Amino acid sequence: MFAPKFILVPTDFSEHSDKAIRQAADIAEQNNAQIYLLHVVDKLQQCAVDYCIPIETLEKLQLDSEKEARRKMEDEVQKILQSKKIDVTFDVKVGIPFAEILREHVERKADLIVIGSHGRTGIKRTLIGSVAEKVMRESKCPVLLVR
């Protein structure tokens, strides 16, 4: 039987991510596993088509986004620890979400990724793309997709 010991749970703070966190917490509790919550803040671009943001403003916006994400992650961890007796750590990274998730999975030797999916199909999925789908295709470990 598969018994993961280190579970990577990417979150974007959506309802789907909350479901994935709850599922991962149940799995962790049953297997005495550690949960690693990860949020990736998209790296802000300084320039758009015809406008550039001053670098100081961009850096402040990026820092504010990271601080807010860390605050939300601390809240998520507290919610988990109120109902489960499991080991939970977290981090906030800046970059391309699917790439950072895959990098963290390899670096931390995760043996399971539990990720929420919005469930879009058809043209919406094609236009918007799916972090969960990219993670599923590229991951070297099992991925549990939670809807």
Region roles according to the model:
Residues 68, 92-96, 118:
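Short beta->alpha linker loops
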